[in-house]
């Protein structure tokens, strides 16, 4: 006969036999070490003797699954064990210790559920818990299962060890019988149920009094299992049927009277009974899920608080939006505009902020090829009249932003001024800006005519007195916003190289300037800051030739 042992096993057997162990002792030791048909069961927990192996096979499989003290792992659905050793829960020990007929029926029901599909049983238990508003916490407290593992098993069908499933099924069978007994009690015993409920609450608060009403055997069980006393009561939970009724009533009346609340109590209890498949006359069997007038009152109070809180949030959001709408940004610029770090009262730019009926919008674009930057500024030319210069009007507002160009920051200027010539200069030259009053423009122009034209830009600063500014009475028939802008460039004209002079020429020939009478002269107005204009040296001659004209474009500034 060919031996099925490996060489290592043969060496071990030879070593045992050579050590003096006889064959009979070795066989007896093997019989003691080999697992019996009831794998995983401690023999002292069974009423039968270890020698009656044939009788052990006839016992229900439930006894072999409820002990769980064996170190070996079972096959099948036990592979998803969460890693912790799972002691036998008290509910299984209690059911195993009972020899009554009811306990035998419960064990048979648990065995039947263990033989079925675990996912089907999990869905059945989950539906029963939802029907009777049973929280998972109650199952965890009774069975000792892990909360996360139980939730995954009921919701997703996660595999669970057979011993744990036996504890879950035991709780399910006993809970079914408990709820059935509650609803099968007669209406006359409702008072006794109330007394018993009060007694249970008292025993929950003072568990030491429970031992006085117990017998010797029950006292020992209570001492051995103290965790049963610490189990919390089930918290009241509104069912879906009751919530639907209450929300419909809340739409009709947000603060019902006591009579209306009592009517809602009866309606909710009736719906809860129908949800559980029992007669509405057995509403007392709802137990902790029984709807009372106080619970209805609290529900309506909580809904009113929630509604008031939502309204407050909506009003806060609305007022915040209104605050932003009342303070819009009046300046329009490209994303390349960089704000100045100086305070608003030190900004050198000005803009017209007085609203007017007739407005002409124009724009100027500065293209810096060296820095690949595009700066676009927009301004509004409004009708300027002696009335608009009244000190009460906010004609000028120093809230403009600085425009960043290569070589340094420049203040915003009127849109009639085009400083495109800055793109032809070096960054070092753009810093050499000349500040001069209007009276010095003639001298600068005369000196530049005799010398070679240079590329140094000139800043013409109008004197602080408005005597240098001659306001123009704009015609009432101004351009509409949909008309073309003031500054237009023709590709074939030599003025295309100098957009500033082209804009000035168009302003002179434009029909928007009517022939006006001699404008009045104004006194010293030092409260208005100086207007800034940027031009180049090649445009000085034309600018000086226009200095005596009554229609100087500076009048629009």
Swiss-Prot record:
Which SMART domains does this entry report, sorted A to Z? HOX
Q: Where is this region: Dimerization?
A: 1-31
* Cystine pairings recorded for this chain: none
Q: Does the keyword Membrane apply?
A: no
In alphabetical order, the GO MF annotations are: cis-regulatory region sequence-specific DNA binding; DNA binding; DNA-binding transcription factor activity; DNA-binding transcription factor activity, RNA polymerase II-specific; identical protein binding; promoter-specific chromatin binding; protein homodimerization activity; protein-containing complex binding
Domain POU-specific atypical: start-end pairs: 93-188
What InterPro entries does its record include? HD, HNF-1, HNF-1_N, HNF-1_POU, HNF1_dimer_N_dom_sf, HNF1b_C, HNF_P1, Homeodomain-like_sf
Record text on subunit structure and interactions: Binds DNA as a dimer. Can form homodimer or heterodimer with HNF1-alpha. Interacts (via HNF-p1 domain) with PCBD1; the interaction increases its transactivation activity.
Function text: Transcription factor that binds to the inverted palindrome 5'-GTTAATNATTAAC-3'. Binds to the FPC element in the cAMP regulatory unit of the PLAU gene. Transcriptional activity is increased by coactivator PCBD1.
Q: Which domain of life is it from?
A: Eukaryota
**GO cellular component term of the entry, any:** nucleus
Which residue ranges does the Swiss-Prot or TrEMBL entry mark as DNA-binding? Answer: 231-311
Q: Where is this region: Disordered?
A: 66-85, 324-370
Q: Name one GO biological process term.
A: hindbrain development
Q: What does the sequence similarity comment in the record state about its family?
A: Belongs to the HNF1 homeobox family.
Q: What keywords appear on the UniProt entry?
A: Activator, DNA-binding, Homeobox, Nucleus, Phosphoprotein, Transcription, Transcription regulation
Q: Where is the HNF-p1 domain?
A: 1-32
Q: Where in the cell is it found?
A: Nucleus
- Chain positions with Phosphoserine modification: 49, 52, 75, 80
The keyword Kinase appears for this protein = no
Quote the SUPFAM superfamilies the UniProt record gives.
Dimerization cofactor of HNF-1 alpha (SSF100957), Homeodomain-like (SSF46689), lambda repressor-like DNA-binding domains (SSF47413)
Bias category Polar residues: which stretches?
354-370
* Gene coding for it: Hnf1b
Q: Which organism is it from?
A: Rattus norvegicus
Query: What is the protein named?
Result: Hepatocyte nuclear factor 1-beta
Q: In which tissues is it expressed?
A: Liver, kidney and intestine.
């Amino acid at each position: 006969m060919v031996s099925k042992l490996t060489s290592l096993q043969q060496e071990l057997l030879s070593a045992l036999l050579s050590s003096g162990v006889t064959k009979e002792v070795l066989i007896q030791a093997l019989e003691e070490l080999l697992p019996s048909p009831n794998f995983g069961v401690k023999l002292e927990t069974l009423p039968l003797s270890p020698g009656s192996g044939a009788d052990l096979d006839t016992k229900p499989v439930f006894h072999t699954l409820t002990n769980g003290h064996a170190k070996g792992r079972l096959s099948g659905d036990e592979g998803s064990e969460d890693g912790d050793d799972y002691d036998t829960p008290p509910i299984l020990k209690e059911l195993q210790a009972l020899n009554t007929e009811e306990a035998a029926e419960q064990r048979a029901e648990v065995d039947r559920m263990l033989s079925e599909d675990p996912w089907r049983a999990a869905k059945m238990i989950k539906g029963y818990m939802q029907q009777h508003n049973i929280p998972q916490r109650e199952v965890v407290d009774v069975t000792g299962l892990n909360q996360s593992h139980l939730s995954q098993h009921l919701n997703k069908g996660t595999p669970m060890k057979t011993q744990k499933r036996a504890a879950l099924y035991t709780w399910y069978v006993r809970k079914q019988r408990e709820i059935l007994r509650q609803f099968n009690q007669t209406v006359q015993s409702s008072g006794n149920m109330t007394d018993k409920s009060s007694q249970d609450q008292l025993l929950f608060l003072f568990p030491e009094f429970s031992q006085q009403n117990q017998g010797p055997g029950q006292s020992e069980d209570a001492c051995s299992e103290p965790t049963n006393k610490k189990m919390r009561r089930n918290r009241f939970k509104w069912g879906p049927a009751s919530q639907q009724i209450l929300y419909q009533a809340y739409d009709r009346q947000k603060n019902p009277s006591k009579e209306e609340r009592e009517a809602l109590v009866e309606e909710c209890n009736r719906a809860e009974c129908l949800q559980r498949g029992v007669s509405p006359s057995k509403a007392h069997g709802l137990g902790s899920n029984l709807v009372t007038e106080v619970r209805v009152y609290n529900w309506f109070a909580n809904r009113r608080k929630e509604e008031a809180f939502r309204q407050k949030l909506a009003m806060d959001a609305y007022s915040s939006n209104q605050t932003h709408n009342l303070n819009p940004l009046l300046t329009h610029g490209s994303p390349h505009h960089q704000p100045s770090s100086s305070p608003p009262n030190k900004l050198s730019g000005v803009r017209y902020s007085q609203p007017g009926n007739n407005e002409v919008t124009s724009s100027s674009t500065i293209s810096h090829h060296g820095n690949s930057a595009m700066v676009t500024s927009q301004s509004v030319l409004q009708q300027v009249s002696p009335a608009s210069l009244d000190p009460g009007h906010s004609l000028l507002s120093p809230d403009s932003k600085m425009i960043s160009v290569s070589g340094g920051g420049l203040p915003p200027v009127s849109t009639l001024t085009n400083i495109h010539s800055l793109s032809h200069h070096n960054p070092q030259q753009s810093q050499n800006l000349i500040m001069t009053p209007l009276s010095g423009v003639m001298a600068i122009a005369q000196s530049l005519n005799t010398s070679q034209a240079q590329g140094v830009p000139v800043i013409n600063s109008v004197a602080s007195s408005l005597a240098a500014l001659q306001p123009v009475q704009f015609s009432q028939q101004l351009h509409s916003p949909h008309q073309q802008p003031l500054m237009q460039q023709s590709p074939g004209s030599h003025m295309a190289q100098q957009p500033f002079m082209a804009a000035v020429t168009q302003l002179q020939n434009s029909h928007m300037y009517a022939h006006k009478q001699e404008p009045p002269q104004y006194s010293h107005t030092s409260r208005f800051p100086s207007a800034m204009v940027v031009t180049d040296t090649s445009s000085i001659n034309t600018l000086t030739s226009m200095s005596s004209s009554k229609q100087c474009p500076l009048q629009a500034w």
